[in-house]
Amino acid sequence: MLDKIQRCAAAAGICFSGTFVASDRADPGFALPVIGNPEREADRRGAVMGLGRGVVAALLVTLAGCAIGPDFAPPPAPTASSWLEWRNKSLQTGPEEYRDWWRVFHDPILDRLIEIAYSQNLTLLSAGTKVLQARATLGIAVGELFPQQQIAAGAITYNLRSLSDSSVVSVGSTASANYWRGLLGVQAAWELDFWGKFRRGVETADSAYLASIATYDDVLVTLLSDVASTYIGIRTTERQIAIARANIVRQRGIVTIARDKYKGGAATLLDVYQAENVLGATEATVPQLTIQLRQGLDALRVLLGMAPQPLGFLLARSTGEIPAAPRKVVVGVPADLLRRRPDIRAAELRAAAQSAQIGVATAELYPAISILGTFGGSASTLLGGNLSNIFQPSGRNFTVGPSFQWNILNYGQITNNVRLQDATLQQYLVDYQNSVLTAQQQVEDGIATFLLSRSQAEYLRRSVAAANGALHIATLEYQQGTRDFTTVLTAEQNLLQAENNLAVATGTIPTGLVAVFRALGGGWQIRDGNGFVTAATSEEMRRRTDWGQLLPAAGEPPLPAPGLPGPEDRGPTVRAPEW
């Protein structure tokens, strides 16, 4: 450990060989203990010069000292060279940023919903406030690098009960039983960042701040995909309701045919009951689907940050038109996920923050070196004195000196804390690698859903066409008396089922494409040039608290924030404080 200390001291260009404390006529009741003879002018000049050298040395220690602990390096990411369906002509591997992927559906209502959700969603707003929390935490960490000062003031009255009291101050035979004493000064303490504890703390806070931005982007990507998926689900349900109602009209006609044939003696009452049974079952699907539609609308309102209210601009077009997906989509290559997925970036930054924590914990194994000092004045009314003398040269006092603290006996607590931080880092590194694997799985799932749902829909279109033809022929032959009613019932049910399945498959195609875009990490760019909280929230917080430049006033541009941040976006470990 001593070798480590010497190496760091040599790197900083500093040699500690003793203890230094300077004092200028310090009042013993206010200042630190005094070493030396402050009455000698030459010694006082030497003390001041020594103080200057000490301050310079402290700056060198802070700026050039060692930073104990590992420097973060991301682990290898387990990525495939290509997607499993890379040969499919519907997939393209060119570069694409997916800035506004929802526009591929050419649905102006969906575009409007995305805009509303981005500006009003409360989950996203909550994530934005966490970015501000992390930014303020970074400011706290930066402040630890600098001397901590306090102003101290006080007034004490002394009331001595008797002349026999040992604390009585006397001159000749005269004792002063009551007097006042005043103190005023500045106290400063500066723990030198010799081992990089505070700089590692800045690294931790900076990485956590960038991770909060990446997490915000991940929430935003999830929000946009949820809005699109919910909207597509609503349109799919509307299509299913329209199909059910069309089949109800058709089945009512068949019930009428069965009744007419029964009245004419060409059919039995069984045919009527069977026709009414199928009709009733189909009619029952409408309330069930309406419940599903209402639930989708309720979910959409939450995503839009709205209280329960009619969504007239959406319901006005309740024709069941499901957004159509394009035939081709650009998916890039798996390695692109490492730079494009916000959650992968966040996982990497959390690991980087934890890596710096190892340095913070390891620094506790080494001595903490601080510079302590006071400057102020004191005066008393003793012997005719005046408290105003506190501002006179005769009342001034000054002390400065180093402090040395070393936790040499802690029964393994510090060492085990270092081990704890290291094990936590390893967990975050594994989490990062797992997030890369999970991202690739989600892309593969989305691609499979998108491609195979199109094939499914094509088969179902043929099924619907055949079911329509079968029902038409069965109904005609039943009317002519050449086919029994069971054939008509079967044809009715088959058509309803085929049309319903086609509606679901048609909705699954764009839903699968949305899942692909979500898995590829697109859409976060919508925040470019905007703050992380709404203007109303920013104004509310500014009225409540002085946020300085962290929350610009209305009309001012927000603080610049990196897009999809990574460890390379961290700032310097030594920087100016933020007031």
Predicted regions and their residues:
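Bacterial N-terminal signal peptides
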Residues: 53-64
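Intrinsic-disorder-associated, low-complexity terminal segments enriched in Asp/Asn/His/Tyr and depleted
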Residues: 3, 24-27, 37, 43
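Short flexible linkers and secondary-structure junctions
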Residues: 67-228, 368-373, 378, 395, ...
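Sec/SRP-type N-terminal targeting helices
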Residues: 125-126, 142-143, 178, 192-220, ...
